[in-house]
């Protein structure tokens, strides 16, 4: 009997074809196999069902989608996802990335999935790489059996954890641990009804403030949501910080420092990703990242100690125009 496909949704955070998130499976899927879904659209009918018994590679289990809705640059209708404070002080990148996910959860697409009794959706931002998706089938079954609402597939905090067996078979040994404030939307599997309930609660509460991850954790506690984090997640979903770091430098005003930063991102991706991470918005006028904060602190140091070096002030000025 034909079964409803599980959607695998690629969320664009950089300029990159969706098939590059799955680099080793071009014989199965390519860019033409991805259906673009925008705001107010639903899944194309032709990809709703499939016979899965004869597919050892598992790719026929899924409907591959690229989500193109939730773009706050093109529309201000997503401001209700954020409080007035966050609309002023949260960085554009933070709001843009969160809005893409919340708009997806709040979309006609998810409502249709609920009506069609689709239980789970796999969501992956396109700065990740998944080389082998065969782990998804046993994971989805285990999530159903163990009543897991969200499986986060990117680890934020490392250290000792109390791990629980999720899948144990001849091909996969997978463990998880319970999530806390270490929330990430980079890659995850979510129950459709859970996504709808979370976004409904966010809207009813007046939108997210600057403490997004604390608020999501609070909502999870209040709604008794079971969020697990995939142990050793990088084995299954590889996040490439170089892609985002390069994207940030490419979107800066072209100058000497942006070219230096782009080159440095290739050699030191983790460091440059951290340095270019936006921290706060200055009343919506511009965002301040880690490098910008260091520059501001350095300017305060020079003012306090009355530094008169013209060279230092010149170099500081070039940093200000580049990173703030």
Swiss-Prot record:
The keyword Amino-acid biosynthesis does not apply. Its main location: virion. It is found in: Virion membrane. GO terms for biological process: symbiont entry into host cell; virion attachment to host cell. It is a single-pass membrane protein. Residues 306-324 are intravirion. Pfam families: Pox_P35. Does not contain disulfide bonds. Immunodominant protein. Envelope protein that binds to heparan sulfate on the cell surface and might provide virion attachment to target cell. This is Envelope protein H3.
């Amino acid at each position: 009997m034909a079964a409803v496909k599980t959607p695998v949704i690629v969320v664009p955070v950089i300029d990159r074809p969706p098939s590059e998130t799955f680099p080793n499976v071009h014989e199965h899927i390519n860019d033409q196999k991805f259906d673009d879904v925008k705001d107010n659209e639903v899944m194309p009918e032709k990809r709703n069902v499939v016979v899965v018994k004869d597919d050892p590679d598992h790719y026929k289990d899924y409907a591959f989608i690229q989500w193109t809705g939730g773009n706050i640059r093109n529309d201000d209708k997503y401001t209700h996802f954020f409080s007035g404070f966050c609309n002023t002080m949260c960085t554009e990148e933070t709001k843009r990335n969160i809005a893409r996910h919340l708009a997806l959860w709040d979309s006609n697409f998810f409502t249709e999935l609920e009506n069609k009794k689709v239980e789970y959706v796999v969501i992956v931002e396109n700065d990740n790489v998944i080389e082998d998706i065969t782990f998804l089938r046993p994971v989805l079954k285990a999530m159903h059996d163990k009543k897991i609402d969200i499986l986060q597939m990117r680890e934020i905090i490392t250290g000792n954890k109390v791990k629980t067996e999720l899948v144990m078979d001849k091909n996969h040994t997978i463990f998880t641990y319970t999530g806390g404030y270490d929330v990430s939307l980079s890659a995850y599997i979510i129950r459709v009804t859970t996504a709808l309930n979370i976004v409904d609660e966010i809207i009813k509460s007046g939108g997210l403030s600057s403490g997004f991850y604390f608020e999501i954790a609070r909502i999870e506690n209040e709604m008794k949501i079971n969020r697990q984090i995939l142990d050793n997640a990088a084995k299954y979903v590889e996040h490439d910080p170089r892609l985002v770091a390069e994207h940030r430098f490419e979107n800066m005003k072209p100058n000497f420092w942006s070219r230096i930063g782009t080159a440095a991102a290739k050699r030191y991706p983790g460091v440059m990703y951290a340095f270019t991470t936006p921290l706060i918005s200055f009343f919506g006028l511009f965002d301040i990242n880690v490098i910008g904060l260091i520059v501001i602190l350095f300017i305060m140091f020079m003012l306090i100690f009355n530094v008169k070096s013209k060279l230092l002030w010149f170099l500081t000025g070039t940093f200000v125009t580049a990173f703030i």
